[in-house]
Amino acid sequence: MNSSTDPTFSELNASFTNTPDTLFATSVSSDPSHGFGEEDYACGTFNCSPKEFVAFVLGPQTLPLYKAVLITIIFGGIFITGVVGNLLVCIVIIRHSAMHTATNYYLFSLAVSDLLYLLFGLPTEVFLYWHQYPDLFGMPFCKIRAFISEACTYVSVFTIVAFSMERFLAICHPLHLYAMVGFKRAIRIITALWIVSFISAIPFGLLSDIQYLNYPLDHSRIEESAFCSMSPKIVNEIPVFEVSFCIFFVIPMILIILLYGRMGAKIRSRTNQKLGVQQGTNNRETRNSQMRKKTVIRMLAAVVITFFVCWFPFHLQRLIFLYAKNMDNYLDINEALFSIAGFAYYVSCTVNPIVYSVMSRRYRVAFRELLCGKAVGAYYNSGFARDHSSFRESSAYDRVHSVHVRASQHPNKFETDSSSANRVLIKKTYSLPLPKNADSTVLSTTDIVIVLENSHTVCEEPKVENDIWIENEETCI
């Protein structure tokens, strides 16, 4: 949408801004005491027609063709990649029981929220570049779109934070995670964050409505100026944007930085300890370990940077509308920031499947299997299918040996009964060769192996009596 309002309209109680959700404007009312002349309205001394007045305040009804086409192509690419990527994540998690883990439940929640926002928000956003006003969808759609868009935004933020805390516990405090282990806990958390998000978005749905401009000469409402908006009077009286900025950006951003910073330090510390033990043994192994450590740290940094880049312009533009309308070059800054915020806002829905899912080898294999219509290799028959039954404390991305463990409560037999869940297994590590087909980008197992509660899983009896061979596999960090 275009921003073409003269700064002097702030004196007329006429101001507006554009956000990825709504266009804000106030009704214009004239006051003889203001003494505005021709330059103030740029359409004669109150002699402009209502149509000219609307065009002056809200900008052209349709953007220039080249700009509308370019934006449509860019947003169309974002829409296709975002919908396809998130759909693949959802289908893979639903189809494969091995993917029914607490971590993947968070990813599923994130994919669903991104899908909803892309479907409800992006098509309308593109349409507004071709037809900014009058609004053609009516008040019900205006309220529903504002409500769902805001709610899905909150769900995405909460899910990323919850997922980050899950990773933090897995890497830095595995014993605490064991005390809270279980799929039901993850489902309860996800359900709660969806409920809280939708409740938090209710004010945006209730306060959004079809707004109109008033013609300054006779104060009549200009029907052709209809647009979906939240009244600026309400925005000025109720700090909805400020609260949203603090709760759904500042606090999550601080938490994410602290959590991933701590995880990065833990990974670096464990890798350095392992390298100290390996000194003088295998230079190639040392180099590979260092490369894997850098890969993980870069990925952790990518999570923080992605969150900041995608969400900060959106909140910044809202704050500029509230507190900086009188600044120099406000209109140019607002228009540029609106384009950047809209692009980054929707790109986050496309980037999330890549950052949180596709970077995992497990997901890449599952995607190939889904697209090709057949299983790829023997990955599903090995460690892939066992991720839902065991959770291991992880350190750096290092090549590790298979771990030989024995159940402390059942020394003669490992549980084949599905009712034996949530038992700690005492680990004994042996220097066993790594299988040739094992993935090199795996996490090393350290002090504890935890069997997660899964009443529907029955572990097969291993060939070696009383023993379990936990194979190398990826753990999503």
Curated annotation (Swiss-Prot):
GO terms for biological process: body fluid secretion; cellular response to desiccation; G protein-coupled receptor signaling pathway; neuropeptide signaling pathway; positive regulation of calcium ion transport. The keyword Nucleotide-binding does not apply. Gene3D superfamilies: Rhodopsin 7-helix transmembrane proteins. It is found in: Cell membrane. Residues 94-109, 167-189, 259-295, 357-447 are cytoplasmic. Keywords: Cell membrane, Disulfide bond, G-protein coupled receptor, Glycoprotein, Membrane, Receptor, Transducer, Transmembrane, Transmembrane helix. Residues 1-72, 131-145, 211-237, 317-335 are extracellular. SUPFAM superfamilies: Family A G protein-coupled receptor-like (SSF81321). It holds the Pfam family 7tm_1. InterPro entries: GPCR_Rhodpsn, GPCR_Rhodpsn_7TM, NeuromedU_rcpt. One of its GO terms (cellular component) is plasma membrane. Acts as a receptor for the neuropeptides CAP-1 and CAP-2, but not CAP-3. Probably a component of signal transduction pathway that leads to Malpighian tubule fluid secretion in response to these ligands. This is Neuropeptides capa receptor. The lineage of its organism: Eukaryota, Metazoa, Ecdysozoa, Arthropoda, Hexapoda.
